[in-house]
Amino acid sequence: MKLGFQPVTVETNAPDEEGCLVLANNRLVAVLVRLSAEHGRKAGRWYLEHGFGKLDGLAQPIFTDLDEAQDWVAQRIS
């Protein structure tokens, strides 16, 4: 399985607009949003805004970086 990330701007009605689509074999499996400075010490981390398929309905974790997010996604969709 090939995982890919595509940068996007996400309309969140908040300062957290920097986003990333997570694709598995060219299928959308998740939307991640980078937390803004208003989140204090969590600023710069990535939040699972929404998951699809096997990621739908799971707890919405916060990842230190995209590598950590990639590992988490790969474990759950394989």
Where is each model-derived feature located?
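Acidic/proline-rich low-complexity IDRs
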Residues: 2, 20, 31-34, 47, ...
